[in-house]
Design a protein with these regions (language model features):
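Conserved ABC transporter NBD signature motif
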Residues: 64-72
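Conserved coupling/switch loops of ABC nucleotide-binding domains, chiefly the family-specific signature
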Residues: 62-65, 216
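The feature captures the beta-strand-to-loop junction immediately N-terminal to the Walker
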Residues: 41-43
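ABC ATPase nucleotide-binding domains
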Residues: 82, 92-236
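A short, flexible loop at the N-terminus of ABC-type nucleotide-binding domains that lies
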Residues: 1-6, 12-27, 32, 75-80, ...
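Non-catalytic connector elements of ABC transporters
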Residues: 244-246, 256-365
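Helix-to-loop junction immediately C-terminal to a conserved catalytic motif
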Residues: 56
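Short beta-strand immediately N-terminal to the Walker A/P-loop
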Residues: 38-39, 85
Length: 365
């Protein structure tokens, strides 16, 4: 088991980096506590896999250190780090049985046969592989093969952490939830540090206790799923997390009022942004309500989508597109309507970053 510390870590694939843009992974300082379930979330190319490969030892960082507990492992080889890594595509030996695949890491370390057999049985029960232990891996489905890959990482009792790099990519959609649930059960049973890399917000938010969101090589926010949804620290987080994502509207802010085109929005906090900064108002569609015309901010309806659990209106206000929730039992004649914004759920951003204003009674928020 291990606490993983990233100390002033950065990486560039070019040999002579000079500017921040030269770095695929911009400087990161972060600690993953022992036994936690974490996710690295972000779009393709944001640096997730680079970071994972640095932790596992497949890539040496350009600068900074990786520590397991208080031990500097930056220059240690992968096999010396006691790390297990599960990749996008299952890594199994098709000519071997499931039992032989699970036993292989222990056999390579000359673990006695009786201990190996016992450990293989334990992991097989945990992963529901007991009934196929003596079948050839070549005859199994992709999700079963991925379970074998996971089992080969878990079978070593000395593993400090398990790293998952998009492990459900090849799994059928209807089986993904089941395998995610299995991972959560394993985490609870073994109390092992797990770091899960994905571009899929559903996978990250349902697996992890804390999520690290990455964008353009940098960490933009770390928090619980609730924190990321309720208080995004960056406009990217607001837009990337949620379906649909947060409405992000260019605005001008004066005190406790935001100006969006020719419309004004009252705020619950007072802001004093520096001159020249790009200001934006963010609010999630769940907190924007479509109403009959004349009862709020005037908008034009472009379409209304029924997404099963709710109806989402796509509207235009002062030339800006945004999404709003449609209350049950309300219908609209024509394309003219109004919006009501919940002032408690409005966030103000300067150059993409959340701004803390002062509440009307003078406190910071």
């Amino acid at each position: 088991m291990a606490r993983i510390t990233l100390d002033h870590l950065a990486h560039a694939y070019r040999p002579d980096p000079h500017t921040a843009d030269d770095y695929a992974l911009k400087e990161i300082n972060h600690v993953w506590s022992q036994g936690g379930a974490y996710a690295l979330l972000g779009p393709s190319g944001c640096g997730k896999t680079t970071l994972l490969n640095i932790i596992s030892g497949l890539v040496r960082p350009t600068r900074g250190r990786v520590l397991f507990d208080d031990l500097d492992v930056t220059d240690l080889a992968t096999e010396a780090r006691n790390i297990a890594q599960v990749f996008q595509f299952p890594v199994v030996y098709d000519t071997m049985s499931v039992r032989e695949n699970l036993a292989f890491p222990l056999k390579n370390r000359h673990v006695p046969r009786d201990r190996t057999a016992q450990r293989v049985e334990e992991i097989a029960r945990l992963l529901d592989l007991t009934r196929v232990l003596d079948r050839k891996a070549s005859n199994l489905t992709a999700d079963m093969k991925q379970k074998i890959s996971l089992g080969r990482g878990l079978v070593r009792p000395d593993v400090a952490a398990i790293l998952f790099d998009e492990p459900l990519t090849v799994i059928d959609p209807h089986l993904k939830w089941q395998l995610r649930s299995t991972l959560k059960e394993i985490h609870r049973a073994l109390d092992i540090t797990m770091i899960y890399v994905t571009h899929d917000q559903t996978e990250a938010l349902t697996f992890a206790d804390k999520v690290v969101v990455m964008h353009d090589g940098a960490v933009v926010q770390t928090g619980t799923p609730d924190e990321l949804f309720e208080r995004p620290a960056h406009t990217f987080v607001g837009h990337f997390i949620g379906s649909p994502g947060m409405n992000i509207l260019p605005c001008r802010v004066e005190g406790a009022t935001a100006f969006i085109g020719d419309q004004t929005v009252a705020l619950q906090r007072t802001y004093r942004p520096p001159y020249g900064e790009r200001m934006e108002l963010g609010i999630r569609p769940e907190f924007v309500r479509l109403q009959p015309r004349g009862t709020g901010l005037p908008v034009r309806i472009r379409r209304i989508d029924d997404i099963g659990r709710a109806r989402i209106a796509r509207v235009e206000m002062s030339g800006r597109a945004l999404a709003a929730s449609v209350p049950d039992g309300i219908s609209f004649d024509g394309d003219e309507a109004a919006l009501a914004l919940d002032p408690r759920q409005i966030h103000i951003y300067a150059n993409g970053h959340l701004v803390s204003g002062e509440s009307i009674d003078g406190g910071r928020a």
